Amino acid sequence: MKKLGTLLVLFLSAIILVACASGKKDTTSGQKLKVVATNSIIADITKNIAGDKIDLHSIVPIGQDPHEYEPLPEDVKKTSEADLIFYNGINLETGGNAWFTKLVENAKKTENKDYFAVSDGVDVIYLEGQNEKGKEDPHAWLNLENGIIFAKNIAKQLSAKDPNNKEFYEKNLKEYTDKLDKLDKESKDKFNKIPAEKKLIVTSEGAFKYFSKAYGVPSAYIWEINTEEEGTPEQIKTLVEKLRQTKVPSLFVESSVDDRPMKTVSQDTNIPIYAQIFTDSIAEQGKEGDSYYSMMKYNLDKIAEGLAK
């Protein structure tokens, strides 16, 4: 009997070692997967797929700039303890002050084992400015087709780490991506009806290149990315001169930037700011745009309305 007990202990130990080596977590006992997302957009997509099956921590607070961020002690702790970490990649958290690179290095986390870029598979667009030329444009989520890629990558890694809930994740993924796909198709039809001479989305940061490509609306901006100088007199003058040659009816300003440079552009061109829109963050809970889906629907509706005036 003693020998049998010893063999049973060895057998169970072997199972635990295999599970640890494969990176899978045993969630049958009710212990949830610990997941970290770098920003509110990725966190919301993750929540739509994982529901209450995980413990989720989002690092960059709603409304703050994910390009350059200083992690708090809680972020460091949660990252160190995480079973799975999702980040955007393509020059967002790893550009600027490279805060995410430092965070995962200090937590001794390994890429494609502990942390994964949800943008894997996106058709990347590159920056064009003198100081940023050749670097990746990180704002891929502003094209709903890329949001679907994000969701699929998230579901894949959740299922790999937590196979006990794979069916649950895949069911939620299907429902969620069908919803995003429907909004994407409806929005493309809407933008196709706007006259070509009115099609120009003007924002503070040049974050809408992926949006432009997806919905056939060229973009113009004051500065290209939030890691460079923002709203200099020269940048404003360049945009004002460009807009005077167009028939664009409306300007837009993002919720996460200083609106003063765009107000100057509006005054100098007599083109009104139609609406505040979202780029790097969803809205606070309970407000319009408080999820990735509602943020994108709000953006698509407001931009179409503003350009149709």
Curated annotation (Swiss-Prot):
Recorded consequence of changing residue 207 to C: In strain: NA-1383/97
Signal peptide: 1-19
Keyword GTP-binding: no
A GO-annotated cellular component: plasma membrane
Keywords, alphabetical: Cell membrane, Lipoprotein, Manganese, Membrane, Metal-binding, Palmitate, Signal, Transport
Binding site for Mn(2+): 67, 139, 205, 280
Effect of residue 120 to E: In strain: NA-1064/97, NA-1383/97 and NA-1508/92
One biological process term in Gene Ontology: metal ion transport
Effect of residue 30 to S: In strain: NA-1064/97
Lipidation (N-palmitoyl cysteine): 20
Resulting phenotype, residue 16 to V: In strain: NA-1508/92
A Pfam family the protein falls into: ZnuA
Compartments where found: Cell membrane
InterPro entries: AdhesinB, Bact_metal-bind_prot9, Lipoprotein_PsaA-like, ZnuA-like
Lipid-carrying residues in chain (S-diacylglycerol cysteine): 20
Effect of residue 193 to N: In strain: NA-1064/97, NA-1383/97 and NA-1508/92
GO molecular function annotations of the record: metal ion binding
Membrane topology, from the record: Lipid-anchor
Knockout consequences: Reduces growth. Severe reduction in intracellular Mn(2+) accumulation without affecting intracellular Zn(2+) accumulation. Severe reduction in survival rates in oxidative stress conditions and in presence of human polymorphonuclear leukocytes (PMNs).
Domain of life: Bacteria
PANTHER family: HIGH-AFFINITY ZINC UPTAKE SYSTEM PROTEIN ZNUA-RELATED, METAL-BINDING PROTEIN HI_0362-RELATED
Physiological role: Part of the ATP-binding cassette (ABC) transport system PsaABC involved in manganese import. Binds manganese with high affinity and specificity and delivers it to the membrane permease for translocation into the cytoplasm. Also acts as an adhesin which is involved on adherence to extracellular matrix. It is an important factor in pathogenesis and infection.
NCBIfam families: ABC_lipo_SloC
Note: Zn(2+) can bind to PsaA but cannot be transported by the permease into the cytoplasm. At high Zn(2+) concentrations, Zn(2+) binding competes for Mn(2+) transport impairing growth and rendering S.pneumoniae hypersensitive to oxidative and polymorphonuclear leukocyte-mediated killing.
Protein name: Manganese ABC transporter substrate-binding lipoprotein PsaA
